[in-house]
Amino acid sequence: MSFDPTGYTLAHEHLHIDLSGFKNNVDCRLDQYAFICQEMNDLMTRGVRNVIEMTNRYMGRNAQFMLDVMRETGINVVACTGYYQDAFFPEHVVTRSVQELAQEMVDEIEQGIDGTELKAGIIAEIGTSEGKITPLEEKVFIAAALAHNQTGRPISTHTSFSTMGLEQLALLQAHGVDLSRVTVGHCDLKDNLDNILKMIDLGAYVQFDTIGKNSYYPDEKRIAMLHALRDRGLLNCVMLSMDITRRSHLKANGGYGYDYLLTTFIPQLRQSGFSQADVDVMLRETPSQFFQ
């Protein structure tokens, strides 16, 4: 796994993902290599050196695509291993044991993904449904805990609309995971400050990683929650990203692009009173501590 701690890190992104079959929408097939390489080049000029790629098994992950993007642009892509959430699980999540699922993750961390030299650097994005953890999701979380305990690689989760984060942490902790090795995803999709503070108090990291998705939750409210965390001295527990998943998100297709975080959101954050040092904590220092 290549990781440059001197640069910025986008903590939760997708470079190649295909949920078009599940959603019956070709826009959900993100696979346009030339457009994505151009955007990675743009990110490099803005100081980004690492992209944490959250596409796991059966989400349309493409290891060779990631390797090619790295070679062409010079950006580091940290790949993941795991299973997403119940609605997207393949049949064998039902039939295989927890130990077998864990071993699959371990193999992708230690040996490589799909016969390539690319090894998973993180167990992710393991998810739960909105307002509940299904039995199969619990099974995957336990498998992820086993794989983490064997390899030491960190865990990054998916919460549906900022629900079940505390329950995710309780489940992982019950199976021996040190919560300082867990980051909870999608904490920025509702008024969620109380739960965020509880998760941080337990030792976990939190992600504001749907920045720019104003139709779900406006960026000005994200900024207000970040101010509340800054006032409490907790920015060292926060990481940022955008969760690009669609063709229409790309700039070449009229979208805001991967650099919206840097070109639009960060200037808004600075204008609201954040210092450059505050920004650097969330985009460089904290990810460098967590992901290496």
Task: Describe the residue ranges of each PLM region.
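Structural preference for beta-strand elements that scaffold enzyme active sites
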Residues: Y8-L10, R49-N50, N76-V78, A120-I122, ...
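Histidine/acidic-residue-rich catalytic or RNA/ligand-binding cores of hydrolases
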Residues: L19-K23, A63, F89, G165-A170, ...
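Short acidic/histidine-rich active-site segments
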Residues: M54, D209-T210, L234-G255
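Active-site gating/metal-coordination segments in enzymes
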Residues: D68-R71, N76-T151, Y205, T210-S215
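Divalent metal-coordination and catalytic microenvironments
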Residues: H12, V51, Y83, H148, ...
